[in-house]
Design a protein with these regions (language model features):
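Non-cysteine beta-strand/loop elements that form the S-adenosyl-L-methionine
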Residues: 45, 50, 77-81, 121, ...
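Glycine-rich, proline-tolerant flexible connector loops at the mouths of alpha/beta enzymes
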Residues: 50-64, 127-130
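Catalytic domains of carbohydrate-active enzymes, especially glycoside hydrolases
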Residues: 29-52, 68-72, 113-119
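A short glycine/small-residue-enriched secondary-structure motif
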Residues: 41-45, 75-91
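Active-site-proximal loop/turn and secondary-structure-junction residues that shape catalytic pockets
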Residues: 29-31, 53, 82-84, 123-127, ...
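Aromatic-lined substrate-binding rim segments of carbohydrate-active enzymes
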Residues: 58-73, 78-79
């Protein structure tokens, strides 16, 4: 592994080989040696590990994953644990809430014990909603959302209908449930040195299936949520694609303003890079990064302006012709080129 002398401001505890914007991607625990060599060839130095086996959410397993990836010069930035992410028991105060919060707390402790200092959390009670897929540029499979004809999905569970959980929930209930959870989680995160970035709702609309998306579906909700948490360890995982789905009108500010605000507060921990055809309320589809309504160079430039030195990852990587690595290679190359471009514009890497 190359020397890593540069501490990251975005997530203290991590060190990088170079200052400034970092580039990573999602990695399976079952990645082959060739998969990891491919990441080396792309100069990917940060991994978002997706662990689907519940029995492997232990500090010992995390250490094993970390040691293997580091032998290829790749550091784990985040471990995904879907068992404590988008959990209706927590979001809606369903039976088993306290047990799920305790599971979340143990997850944080396991991360810290394994030398992993960041996790992404989302607070959706009924999953990510879509309408289906269509052909994008060159026939690539592209996710579509028409809010009038959509259903939710989270790790295989489908959500449909006017009330996905039996009744309509109020905004006050959602806020009370968030506050109950975050006041238990934040002190543990601080004690363990783990940083939690909260992901926007996808899609960020007022309500779906009787559940308001009033907290992480708009800018003012984010601000209030961070004030309630009142913790340096609770911040934002900014999904650019989700913010673009809502647009400036739906979210309250555009994605550039959001970056400047959260980055200026040192609350920006991680960034998901994705583009879409247009903002709601009209139906939209996901696009290649260079083919949506947002100029992604301006997004990267805003990240550079606030001296963001956390990881940017490609989100919803397109399944291109040419094999499973083609979409990843396109995405990483596009992101790395933008990083190089904005660094050249500023004359140096962030923090240099």
């Amino acid at each position: 592994m190359r020397p890593r002398p540069n501490p990251l401001r975005a997530v203290p505890g991590y060190f990088a080989s170079e200052q400034g914007l970092q580039v990573g991607t999602s990695v399976s625990p079952d990645a082959s040696d060739d998969d990891l060599k491919f990441l080396q060839q792309l100069d990917v130095q940060w991994a978002m590990l997706i662990v689907n086996n519940p029995e492997h959410h232990t500090a010992a397993h995390y250490r094993q994953y970390r040691e293997r990836l580091e032998s290829y010069g790749i550091q784990i930035y985040r471990v995904a644990n879907h068992g404590v992410h988008n959990v209706p028991e927590i979001t809606l105060n369903l039976p088993g809430r306290d047990e799920k919060i305790e599971e979340f707390i143990q997850f944080i402790r396991n991360l810290s014990a394994a030398g992993i200092y960041y996790n992404t959390y989302a607070h959706m009670g009924n999953g990510i909603w879509s309408t289906g897929h269509t052909d994008g540029r060159g026939g690539v499979n592209a996710r579509v959302l028409d809010i009038k004809n959509a259903e939710g999905n989270w790790i295989g569970e489908i959500f449909t209908g006017e009330h996905t959980h039996g009744r309509a929930y109020s905004e006050d209930e959602l806020w009370d449930n968030y506050e109950y959870m975050i006041r238990k989680i934040a002190p543990v995160a601080e004690n363990e040195g783990v940083y939690i970035g909260i992901h926007p709702d996808d899609p960020p609309v007022y309500a779906l299936g009787g559940i308001p998306r009033c907290i992480f579906g708009q800018f003012d909700g984010y601000k209030r949520a961070l004030e309630i948490a009142d913790s340096p360890n609770i911040g934002v995982c900014l999904c650019v694609g989700c913010w673009l789905e809502g647009g400036a009108e739906g979210m309250g500010v555009d994605v550039i303003e959001a970056i400047r605000y959260f980055g200026g507060m040192n609350k920006l921990f991680k960034v998901h890079f994705r583009n879409v055809s247009n903002p709601m309320p009209e139906p939209w589809q996901e696009t290649f990064m260079d083919d949506g309504y947002q100029d992604m160079h301006q997004v990267m430039r805003a990240l550079r302006e606030v001296d963001f030195d956390g990881v940017v990852i490609p989100d919803h990587i397109p399944g291109m012709a040419g094999g499973p690595g083609a979409g990843l290679a396109y995405s990483i190359a596009y992101i790395r080129a933008l990083v190089q471009a904005v660094n050249n514009e500023f004359g140096e890497a962030a923090g240099g």
